[in-house]
């Protein structure tokens, strides 16, 4: 029985890692045609208005330079003028199609994120026994490590997450999450999160070190401060 309980967290941990990814991928593949059809038929009018007001005008900044050539075009034959307008029309359709696909992918990503969150929540509430065993494994593993290795690991993780070279990594990660949930890219909001989130983590870490590690392992705190200096 103990051996059986010891082996239980292995498939549990593997399912936590792979099952949400597999279900979200299957969901995306099966739902994409339906979402595409729904968006193209039911949301096309609203979407085109949004494109005209926000996105396409920005993409047409480069095309505005072409309209400065009107004086030259007036000297062209009628067939050349028609070709010019046909080219502009094709470019407009291409931009609308590209933005349409982006919005469809945003809907799919948002849906799969909700599914993954629901699956992980189910694991948390339904797998209490496995979580207890897994937690005991982690605590036993950390307990068997020396204080030097623990201090080195804490220092490595903190330098990676809140070190002086970490803002670029936080910017990429927050920007990716921001885009994955369908929000428009905003440099000011991302910069604000990058400048505040590591500070919050640093404060939490210092609180954890001084109020928890000082009671559990004072020698670890001494080694950590010695390595940090």
From Swiss-Prot:
The lineage of its organism: Eukaryota, Viridiplantae, Streptophyta, Embryophyta, Tracheophyta. The chain crosses the membrane at residues 7-27, 106-126, 189-209. This is Potassium/proton antiporter CemA. One of its GO terms (molecular function) is antiporter activity. InterPro entries: CemA (IPR004282). Contributes to K(+)/H(+) antiport activity by supporting proton efflux to control proton extrusion and homeostasis in chloroplasts in a light-dependent manner to modulate photosynthesis. Prevents excessive induction of non-photochemical quenching (NPQ) under continuous-light conditions. Indirectly promotes efficient inorganic carbon uptake into chloroplasts. One of its GO terms (biological process) is potassium ion transport. It is a multi-pass membrane protein. It comes from the Eukaryota. Pfam families: CemA. It catalyses: K(+)(in) + H(+)(out) = K(+)(out) + H(+)(in). It is found in: Plastid, Chloroplast inner membrane. Belongs to the CemA family. Keywords: Antiport, Chloroplast, Hydrogen ion transport, Ion transport, Membrane, Plastid, Plastid inner membrane, Potassium, Potassium transport, Transmembrane, Transmembrane helix, Transport. Its main location: plastid. One of its GO terms (cellular component) is chloroplast inner membrane.
